[in-house]
Swiss-Prot record:
GO CC field: chromatin; cytoplasm; HULC complex; nucleoplasm; nucleus; plasma membrane; replication fork; XY body
CDD domains in UniProt: UBCc_UBE2A_2B (cd23790)
Physiological role: E2 ubiquitin-conjugating enzyme that accepts ubiquitin from the ubiquitin-activating enzyme E1 and transfers it to a E3 ubiquitin-protein ligase. In vitro catalyzes 'Lys-11'-, as well as 'Lys-48'- and 'Lys-63'-linked polyubiquitination. Together with the E3 enzyme BRE1 (RNF20 and/or RNF40), plays a role in transcription regulation by catalyzing the monoubiquitination of histone H2B at 'Lys-120' to form H2BK120ub1.
Active-site residues per Swiss-Prot or TrEMBL entry: C88
Major subcellular site: membrane
A Pfam family recorded for this sequence: UQ_con
Pathway given in the UniProt record: Protein modification; protein ubiquitination
Gene: UBE2B
Family membership noted in the UniProt record: Belongs to the ubiquitin-conjugating enzyme family.
Name of the featured protein: Ubiquitin-conjugating enzyme E2 B
Length: 152
């Protein structure tokens, strides 16, 4: 069944294939265009460098008028990521716009890795370390980067 949300997701997928952003990839799961699997590679020159972080993106039939739900499947230590992998990012909540597509969502999350918002912490321990003890924060991030290599 073709719906506006499904047609839009097909366009998003086509755009992602034709003009893939650096360091991110995503595709619908095999038998459900409303659920995507994605990967974000840790940005160069950041504590997340060399990490391979898996995510799942779930869309409703109200997409693109409503944002998708995005969660890290890979373990993540970041001020704006909850323990269950949910991401605290304004464009996935109150600043959502139907002009955003899968590509822009993934690149925004990739940027968030290096530029957390400590004023909106989802993980207070990570936020505190990020602000008060960068070296310890980076050590914890290094551990999850190494762990990401073994995630299958």
């Amino acid at each position: 069944m073709s719906t506006p949300a499904r047609r839009r997701l097909m366009r998003d997928f086509k755009r992602l294939q034709e003009d893939p952003p650096v360091g991110v990839s995503g595709a619908p799961s095999e038998n459900n265009i409303m659920q995507w699997n994605a990967v974000i590679f840790g940005p160069e020159g950041t504590p997340f460098e060399d990490g391979t972080f898996k995510l799942v993106i779930e869309f409703s039939e109200e997409y693109p008028n409503k944002p998708p739900t995005v969660r890290f499947l890979s373990k993540m230590f970041h001020p704006n990521v909850y323990a269950d992998g949910s991401i605290c990012l304004d464009i996935l909540q109150n600043r959502w716009s139907p002009t955003y597509d899968v590509s822009s969502i993934l690149t925004s999350i990739q940027s968030l890795l290096d530029e957390p918002n400590p004023n909106s912490p989802a993980n207070s321990q990570a936020a505190q370390l990020y602000q008060e003890n960068k070296r310890e924060y980076e050590k914890r991030v290094s551990a999850i980067v190494e762990q990401s290599w073994n995630d299958s």
